[in-house]
């Protein structure tokens, strides 16, 4: 039977039979590797790039009628630096879902990408440690520019250095109530630092704040 987390991600990332996924990132990273496995599981097709090249990426979208992709913000920036005539030379209308994460995306960059590709861009925030996940559709982002979304998996808290809750709009460390246990290989000290004193919460050290609607905005990543 499908695992609960798999079922959750399948719905959130709109994984579906017949999807054609383009992966421009190395498979030794957890996110693209997971995307590859999920796509195979639902009966989709995956096109894997040996390395990211912005114009080649666009040409592959047109050639294979790519419906889905998983990217990082630097890839957006590199594509936007292409001459306008090059960007417009390729048909990207087949795109339905483009998921990005791994690093903060500058507001101007994401705004330009949504203007170019339409509201197909989805953003997530999480870590390999799998404590929790936030998610944001293009439509949500346009009304909350700069957000990485609301919590969809886990329970999040923004705490100050004294482990006290931060007020709305005040930046602090992003903590998640433990959804899973993890430890760093041969690094007991770092593992201990990642947990709260009572070990009910964990963090990777990222900083951020939430607005009144619970949307998370990152201010610094570890």
Locate predicted features:
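Conserved AMP-binding/adenylation subdomain of ANL enzymes
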Residues: 1-24, 28-67, 82
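Active-site phosphate/pyrophosphate- and oxyanion-stabilizing loops and adjacent acidic/basic residues
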Residues: 7, 77, 111, 146, ...
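Short, P/G- and charge-enriched loop/turn segments at secondary-structure junctions
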Residues: 9-10, 140-147, 194-196
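Alpha-helix capping/helix-boundary segments
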Residues: 53, 75-76, 105
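Short coil-to-beta-strand transition motifs
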Residues: 148-153, 202
């Amino acid at each position: 039977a499908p695992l609960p987390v798999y079922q959750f991600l399948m719905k959130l990332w709109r994984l579906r039979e017949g999807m054609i996924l383009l992966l421009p990132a190395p498979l030794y990273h957890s996110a693209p590797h997971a995307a590859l496995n999920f796509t195979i599981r639902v009966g989709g097709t995956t096109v894997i790039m040996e390395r990211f090249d912005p114009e080649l990426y666009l040409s592959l979208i047109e050639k294979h009628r790519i419906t889905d992709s998983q990217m990082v913000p630097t890839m957006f920036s590199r594509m936007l630096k292409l001459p306008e005539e090059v960007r417009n030379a390729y048909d990207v209308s087949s795109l339905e879902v483009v998921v990005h994460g791994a690093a903060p995306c500058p507001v101007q960059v994401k705004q330009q990408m949504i203007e170019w590709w339409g509201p197909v861009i989805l953003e997530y925030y999480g870590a390999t440690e799998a404590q929790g996940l936030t998610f944001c559709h293009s439509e949500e982002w346009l009304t909350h520019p700069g957000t990485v979304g609301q919590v969809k998996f886990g329970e999040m808290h923004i705490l100050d250095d004294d482990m006290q809750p931060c007020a709305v709009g005040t930046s602090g460390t992003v903590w998640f109530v433990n959804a899973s246990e993890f430890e760093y290989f041969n690094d007991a000290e770092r593992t201990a630092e990642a947990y709260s004193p009572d070990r009910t919460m964990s963090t990777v050290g990222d900083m951020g704040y939430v607005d009144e609607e619970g949307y998370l905005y990152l201010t610094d990543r570890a």
